[in-house]
Amino acid sequence: MNGAESLVRTLVGGGVEVCFANPGTSEMHFVAALDRVDGMRCVLGLFEGVVTGAADGYYRMSDTPAATLLHLGPGLVNGLANIHNANRAMSGMVNIVGDHATYHRQYDAPLASDIEGLARPNSHWVKTSPDARAIAGDGALAIAAARRPPGKIATLILPADTAWNEGSGPANVPPPARPTPPSADAVEEAARVLRSGEPTLMLLTGRAVCEDGLALAGKIAEKTGTRLVAQGFNARTQRGRGRVSVERIPYVVDQALGVLAGLKHIILVGSKMPIAFFAYPNKPSKLYPEDCEGHVLARPDEDQIAALEMLCEAVGARQIPAPVVNRERPVLGSGAITSGALGASIGALLPENAVVADEAMTTGRGFFAPTEAAAPHDWLSNMGGSIGFGPPLATGAAVACPDRKVVGLQADGSAMYTVQALWTQAREGLDLTTVLFSNRAYHILKGELASVGAGNPGRKALDMLDLGHPDIDWVGLAKSLGVPGARVADMDGFNRRFAEGLATPGPYLVEVVV
């Protein structure tokens, strides 16, 4: 058994059942080993950003790391934007990055690079496995690192001769680590703040915005009168009818300042004190008042559900009913296409237990409120801000949840970064409907031009934000990648085609001209 097979058997034995891959020459022994080992699903991506973004989506919906297979340093670099997003979302993944044979490195071949140096800024654990007999043990360490709560990025570098030489067989992987128990002192401090009567907000993310966490937080809010707010972007929010609703901190600085004005205390549950996404002239970086104090109830690596249970007990909220959403779904939007009408129709048509991958950008800013009373669903957001995460994320979520409908809400400019994900969706037959908002512009940047005080843009500036000339034919592009679809220009057309996509097994794309 060579080193590559030893590694694959270790991955499968350690619960890593999916490998999103874009291999090259140095990874051929790993690819060959996949044929000899049962239990590993291999999913090909035509660009490394699709591979790493899919691993992020897979972890968010399965709580289990996938492996990625990347080709040397340039392959890793091509995938780094979505590794950055996964890191910010606290998703676990095991990156297997091929390298030249150890004896070949001295010759500085064209693809040679400092892979460890490239990996380290966005990895919690990095190692180059020195020989075939070490690779299985190193693979076990990588899996253990990726499974550390709440999820970590592990990067294992696999030299070609480590893969092809005789290995030592698979290694055992230790059981997954459990979250750190919450601090009793932190719980008592939060309870004291809630009893003080001063303006207080609980800022939630992570497990706290999943169904169980929101139910507990809702009980606490009902008992104490505190406000519940989620971070502006969250890895996975469970929402819809029968669940506790939570608003998000707005992206726009002035709006966020209004939401947080007058606060004296923020209780942090998996979150950190809120700051602006970017710096803007004459606007603060901190979104909270200067005299507002932060109190950590639970860090990201701590058991947030246990912390909320303890706080619920401490404030006497255990028997309080959680304030769940019980309104009817919104009615279908009609007439001209607007953000509000789209949000209403999405909320009306979204199927039970759907997964929404949201990279709708400017068009989608109004979607959260009208989908509040939709059927129960999970909402996945971009935690790292690097665009092109939506199509890969939706792909990984669909691999993780084959029995659930995945809906991608997708801006056109961002989609062009990772459009290759459509091909993977078609090849794998993933049950995924993409709603592509085609405003033929980097529309968000038009607002940013004004926000940063850049003055009145001229022709050259506006050309940098324009995605027309030529217009992208999204239906034709999707068809060329194996995904059927339709273009719509009014709400009646959208309602019909979105419903058609939801009813169609496999991938489907609705281009919405906005």
Region spans (language model):
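Thiamine diphosphate
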Residues: I96, H104-L111, K223, G366-V514
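Conserved short loop/turn motifs at secondary-structure junctions
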Residues: T205-V209, P330-V331, A411-G413
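N-terminal alpha/beta PP-like core and its mobile active-site loop of ThDP/TPP-dependent enzymes
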Residues: M1-P321, L349, L432-T434, A499
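Short, small-residue-rich loop/turn micro-motifs
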Residues: P23, V97, A160, G232, ...
